[in-house]
């Protein structure tokens, strides 16, 4: 549901701001330096310091989301893409409809690394990469990657369902965290969503969350 997505993105923005405060208090520049200090027991948990896990936010079909939630989704995603990398929060967006009203100027400005498979037209290619060419790809994993205005043509590997299952089983077999990472819960006010609260209770989570 769009409202749940907006709440989650807002929670991640609150988490991002909290992490930057911890970096400032620790006198470090990024998550790698912070966690190194924490492992060496230089940072005191009693003063609010904690180990920071990396978080990857994946939006599978961004077009559906932007059409239903609009600016409510675009603003927090742009904030996270712009500032959150240094504190270990990364955003991946995917869409099958690369139109200008989906991949807006705000989104493009904050996602320097972009990739495109075969698209229907040169306009779609320009929307994603700021350059034509993706409309001439041959398909079957043929793709273009744009990173800081440099475009490279590469072949994406095909992963079938059994291999995906094997990878997921391998990840699931590794030791994990003893408990889920609880994000700060945004509070709904008259002007929208704001940060606050103590976290999302387990009872309010999806029934398949722990799976």
PLM feature segments, named:
Residues 1-7:
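A short, structured beta-strand-centered segment in the mid-to-C-terminal lobe
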Residues 7-211:
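P-loop NTPase motor-domain active sites and their immediate coupling elements
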């Amino acid at each position: 549901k769009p409202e749940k997505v907006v709440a989650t993105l807002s929670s991640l923005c609150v988490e991002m701001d909290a992490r930057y405060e911890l970096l400032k208090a620790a006198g470090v520049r990024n998550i790698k330096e912070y966690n190194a200090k924490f492992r060496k027991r230089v940072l005191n948990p009693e003063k609010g310091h904690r180990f920071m896990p990396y978080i990857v936010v994946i939006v599978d079909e961004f077009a559906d989301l932007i059409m239903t939630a609009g600016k409510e989704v675009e603003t927090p995603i742009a904030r996270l893409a712009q500032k959150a990398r240094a504190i270990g929060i990364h955003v991946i967006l995917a869409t099958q409809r690369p139109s200008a009203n989906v991949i807006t100027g705000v989104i493009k400005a904050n996602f320097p690394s972009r990739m495109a498979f075969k698209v229907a037209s040169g306009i779609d290619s320009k929307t994603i990469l700021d350059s034509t060419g993706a409309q001439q790809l041959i398909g079957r994993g043929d793709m273009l990657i744009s990173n800081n205005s440099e475009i490279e043509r590469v072949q994406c590997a095909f992963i079938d369902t059994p291999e995906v299952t094997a990878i997921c089983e391998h990840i699931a077999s590794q030791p994990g965290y003893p408990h889920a990472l609880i994000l700060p819960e945004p509070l709904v006010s008259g002007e929208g969503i704001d940060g606050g609260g103590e976290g999302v209770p387990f009872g309010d989570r999806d029934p398949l969350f722990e799976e």
